[in-house]
Amino acid sequence: MAERALEPEAEAEAEAGAGGEAAAEEGAAGRKARGRPRLTESDRARRRLESRKKYDVRRVYLGEAHGPWVDLRRRSGWSDAKLAAYLISLERGQRSGRHGKPWEQVPKKPKRKKRRRRNVNCLKNVVIWYEDHKHRCPYEPHLAELDPTFGLYTTAVWQCEAGHRYFQDLHSPLKPLSDSDPDSDKVGNGLVAGSSDSSSSGSASDSEESPEGQPVKAAAAAAAATPTSPVGSSGLITQEGVHIPFDVHHVESLAEQGTPLCSNPAGNGPEALETVVCVPVPVQVGAGPSALFENVPQEALGEVVASCPMPGMVPGSQVIIIAGPGYDALTAEGIHLNMAAGSGVPGSGLGEEVPCAMMEGVAAYTQTEPEGSQPSTMDATAVAGIETKKEKEDLCLLKKEEKEEPVAPELATTVPESAEPEAEADGEELDGSDMSAIIYEIPKEPEKRRRSKRSRVMDADGLLEMFHCPYEGCSQVYVALSSFQNHVNLVHRKGKTKVCPHPGCGKKFYLSNHLRRHMIIHSGVREFTCETCGKSFKRKNHLEVHRRTHTGETPLQCEICGYQCRQRASLNWHMKKHTAEVQYNFTCDRCGKRFEKLDSVKFHTLKSHPDHKPT
């Protein structure tokens, strides 16, 4: 009986002990549910440093190769680890093949750069075409039309009376041929789509070759005389019509040998650079039908041509007059420029051949419409006005106007015979018998208009006027009047009127687009995703800052101690170390954390206490 009485007591004690252990376990479980014990600041800093070191070991700084790496990974569909392993194995195979070090690269042969020809048109081929056509056809070719259809170059159409035609593309030095252009060599040699095998409407024999007559030779000579190289280069034209670039010693040696030369025009600058296409215009000035600019000064001659409406004139083109004693070099082989292209004006006597020469130092003039049939006289006052215009304008753009037919009587009455010639820029007087009517014309390249800064005001000294904000405590300074006015109206007068409607936010902005950009934060949409790790963001600039963790960029730097960081917030927080003690006057109602600004408290509440409803 006694043993049986002891057994229930032992069982009760065992049950009580088991109940105590269970209660202890439940208490321990309850303590774990409340969270782990808070670490000290030193322990937290030590753990943060250890985790950062582990992350730095795994981090690979790609730098500028980050973009190509992402593209390669996207095309291959591999992970970063698989792609890296493949590249390492590929590099090992290349290293074993060439028995070199991993960082040695296979030497590449440098690409030889094509040398562009200095002259636009090769006169040697032009002479060959002209001589061949002369043996096959009795008629002399002349310039039929200019077709600036393509804009990059002008197509000159040369045609004889038998109908043999040749199309020549004349490129402007303002738009030089690129070295990578496969057709640059052909253009440099004067070859175009319809070269010596171009079809003609008259015959089917070899005479269908495109004729290059005296006008072609004169035009190509003028094109070669114009330097396509940088300003200051020059060249010469021999009796064979070949343009040769030269220096001063070369010229002296050729002059001693007695080689007849035709030097480049003396004008340098836009006038010399834009002399490319030859447009013969049969202009007659004077009382007689065969008078050619007798006793006419250089400026007056330019004014005459500028006021003359020429058929086929391209709108927006520049007109340059070239004349002088260099015509003998072009006519040494008996070549004369045929200017008998019909003008369609009966009785004007424009069917006669006019000899051509070159005149140096003539500036461009602005072309204007002639004043009907009202005769005008060129007195001393008008000549003085022309000189003033020439001094003020280095290069005049032609006004866009409608094409009109030239009228010979108007031109005859424009410049009287009594006008006294004036000296040229080099001090030599022009000989009227050596003058010509060669006019060079190219389509003028449209100038890019730079958009001027709006509302900028210049003071008397030519400096930008600065606009200082007049309100007390504001140190903003602007150089544009519109920006200054926007600042005053929005910041000091109107204020932040755009309020965020999200509950608990209430942030205000000056502009509506700033509010729309802010509303993305409350929408929860993350449309900006990192290509490397897949992390998404609500704002694009947040993604750009995050990418710096992969590339290792630290573009922001402290001006005092040199501390570098990735984002502006880190730099602002760091700068507090160099300033006075910051006053934390705002406290969170839930956790008691203190902040410097009220906006920081609102942002902290939204992020750390999302369930808290503002009172």
UniProtKB/Swiss-Prot annotation:
Q: What does this protein do?
A: Transcriptional repressor. May repress NR5A1, PPARG, NR1H3, NR4A2, ESR1 and NR3C1 transcriptional activity.
Q: Where is the composition biased (Acidic residues)?
A: 419-432
Q: Name one GO molecular function term.
A: transcription corepressor activity
Q: Which family does it belong to?
A: Belongs to the krueppel C2H2-type zinc-finger protein family.
Its BP terms in the Gene Ontology are: extracellular negative regulation of signal transduction; negative regulation of transcription by RNA polymerase II; regulation of transcription by RNA polymerase II
Q: Which PANTHER family match?
A: ZINC FINGER PROTEIN, ZINC FINGER PROTEIN 653
Name of the encoding gene = ZNF653
Question: What keywords are assigned to this protein?
Answer: DNA-binding, Metal-binding, Nucleus, Repeat, Repressor, Transcription, Transcription regulation, Zinc, Zinc-finger
Placement of sequence motif Nuclear localization signal:
107-118, 445-451
Keyword Magnesium appears in the UniProt entry: no
Q: Which InterPro entries match?
A: Zinc_finger_trans_reg, Znf_C2H2_sf, Znf_C2H2_type
Q: Which organism is it from?
A: Homo sapiens
Q: What is this protein called?
A: Zinc finger protein 653
Segments of skewed composition (Low complexity): 193-205
Biased-composition ranges for Basic residues? 108-117
